[in-house]
From Swiss-Prot:
One cellular component (GO) term of this entry: extracellular region
Keywords: Disulfide bond, Glycoprotein, Protease inhibitor, Repeat, Secreted, Serine protease inhibitor
Protein name: Ovomucoid
First-listed, main subcellular location of the protein, grouped into a coarse class: secreted
InterPro entries reported for this sequence: Bifunctional_prot_inhibitor, Kazal_dom, Kazal_dom_sf, Prot_inh_Kazal-m
SS bond list: 8-38, 16-35, 24-56
Domain notes: Avian ovomucoid consists of three homologous, tandem Kazal family inhibitory domains.
Subcellular localization: Secreted
Kazal-like domain ranges (all copies): 6-56
Site features described as Reactive bond 3, chain residue numbers: 18-19
GO molecular function, one term: serine-type endopeptidase inhibitor activity
Keyword Disulfide bond: yes
Source organism of this protein record: Cyrtonyx montezumae (Montezuma quail)
Record: glycosylation sites: 45
Amino acid sequence: FAAVSVDCSEYPKPACTLEYVPICGSDNKTYGNKCNFCNAVVESNGTLTLSHFGKC
């Protein structure tokens, strides 16, 4: 079983595209794309993690 992860090393970014590729975070919130998710991960000081790809 491989752990799902997202590489957020190039974030945070000042602006995200409107591309819709939903990611479900460990906070049970659906993020619109990797950029939005990674920005939130950075803001949470790493406490937010990936639950799964797709809507929560």
